[in-house]
Curated annotation (Swiss-Prot):
It is found in: Secreted. Belongs to the long (3 C-C) scorpion toxin superfamily. Gene3D superfamilies: Knottin, scorpion toxin-like. Only three disulfide bridges can be formed, because only seven cysteines are present. This is Toxin Boma6e.
Length: 66
């Protein structure tokens, strides 16, 4: 498990503006909890605590939306 920004497809973070949204998103994906990281290196995005290894996370590089 690891603490990280949870990622969507194509290395894109989940943008948000509320801790409740991030906590729900992270726990539904198996994390212990989640929070809204404001003004982070990837903008306002969800940060998960104890995210399982099988869930994608934001890695270095750009978001590549189709």
């Amino acid at each position: 498990v690891r603490d990280a920004y949870i990622a969507q497809n194509y290395n894109c973070v989940y943008a948000c503006a509320r801790d409740a949204y991030c906590n729900d998103l992270c726990t539904k994906n198996g994390a212990r909890s989640g929070l809204f990281a404001t003004f982070g290196p990837h903008g306002d995005a969800c940060w998960c605590i104890a995210l399982p290894n099988n869930v994608p996370l934001k890695v270095q590089g750009k978001c590549h939306r189709k």
